[in-house]
C-alpha cells in the first residue's frame, strides 16, 4: 500500500474519468485559466470525487503545459502534422486528439522514447518545457518547438485514507499545510522561465539551436476547431456539467 503520493491528472485519469477534464484539447489558453480551475469550485468538485476513491486530496500542483516538438519542421497548422509520428503518453484522449490533427500518435514509455527520437523512429513528442530542457531533447534532433498550450497537467497531492485515519488531528493539519506549501512552490517553479516577463528557459532552449514557434490566437483556434469533435466526445465521458463549470470559470478569469 502507498501512504502518500503526488500524481499526474493524466496518469490517474483511467481510474478517475473526471480528471480527463484537464486533457481536453485547448480547454484553457494559459496559467490564469488553469488557476481558475484548480483553485476554484472545479478543483473542489474534483477533490470531492477523489475523496470517494480512498484518498484524502491535499493540494493541486502543476506538471506544466505540454508543448510540441519535432525534428522535421515548424508546426503552425494541423496540416504540418500530417503523417508525423508523435510520441504520446498512453491515454486514449491523446490518441484521439493527435489522430484528429492528422498525426500518427505513437504510445511508448519515456525510456523508449528518447532513443526513438535520436534515431528518428518517431518524429516528435509532447511534454512540458522543463522536460524538454532537462532531457536535452535538442541533442536528440528535436530542432522545432511549438508553443501551443493544448493542455495543462496538474499534479495532485494525496494521502491514503487508511493512513490518515491513524494520524492525530495535529499531524493531519501539519501534513496538509506542508502539502499546500509544497504545491504552491511547485506552481511557481513550473512556470519559471516560461512566463510573460520571465522567459529565461525559452531563451536557453533557443540558444541550443531550437526554432521556437509561438502560435497566434488565430492559429491556435484552427487547432482547437480541428479537435472539437474530440473535445465533445470526451466532455460526455467526463460529465458535461463539470465541463461547463470549467468553461465558465476559465471565461471569468480572462
Label the model's feature ranges.
Residues 1-33, 41-44, 48-254:
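N-terminal secretory/targeting leader peptides
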Amino acid at each position: 500500500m502507498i501512504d502518500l503520493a503526488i500524481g499526474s491528472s493524466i496518469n490517474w485519469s483511467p481510474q478517475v474519468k473526471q480528471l480527463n477534464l484537464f486533457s481536453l484539447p485547448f480547454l484553457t489558453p494559459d496559467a490564469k485559466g488553469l488557476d481558475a480551475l484548480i483553485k476554484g469550485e472545479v478543483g473542489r468538485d474534483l477533490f470531492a470525487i477523489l475523496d470517494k476513491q480512498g484518498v484524502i486530496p491535499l493540494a493541486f500542483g502543476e506538471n506544466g503545459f505540454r508543448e510540441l516538438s519535432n525534428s522535421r519542421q515548424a508546426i503552425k497548422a494541423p496540416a504540418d502534422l500530417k503523417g508525423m509520428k508523435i510520441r504520446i503518453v498512453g491515454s486514449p484522449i491523446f490518441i484521439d486528439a493527435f489522430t484528429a490533427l492528422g498525426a500518427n500518435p505513437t504510445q511508448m514509455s519515456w525510456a523508449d522514447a528518447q532513443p526513438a527520437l535520436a534515431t528518428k523512429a518517431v518524429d516528435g513528442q509532447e511534454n512540458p518545457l522543463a522536460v524538454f530542457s532537462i532531457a536535452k531533447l535538442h541533442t536528440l534532433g528535436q530542432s522545432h518547438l511549438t508553443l501551443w498550450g493544448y493542455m495543462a497537467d496538474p499534479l495532485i497531492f494525496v494521502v491514503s485514507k487508511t493512513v490518515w485515519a491513524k494520524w492525530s488531528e495535529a499531524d493531519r493539519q501539519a501534513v496538509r499545510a506542508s502539502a499546500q506549501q509544497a504545491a504552491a512552490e511547485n506552481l511557481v517553479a513550473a512556470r519559471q522561465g516560461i512566463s510573460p516577463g520571465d522567459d529565461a528557459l525559452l531563451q536557453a532552449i533557443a540558444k541550443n539551436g531550437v526554432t521556437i514557434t509561438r502560435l497566434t490566437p488565430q492559429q491556435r483556434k484552427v487547432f482547437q476547431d480541428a479537435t472539437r469533435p474530440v473535445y465533445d466526445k470526451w466532455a460526455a465521458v467526463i460529465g458535461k456539467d463539470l465541463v461547463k463549470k470549467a468553461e465558465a470559470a476559465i471565461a471569468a478569469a480572462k
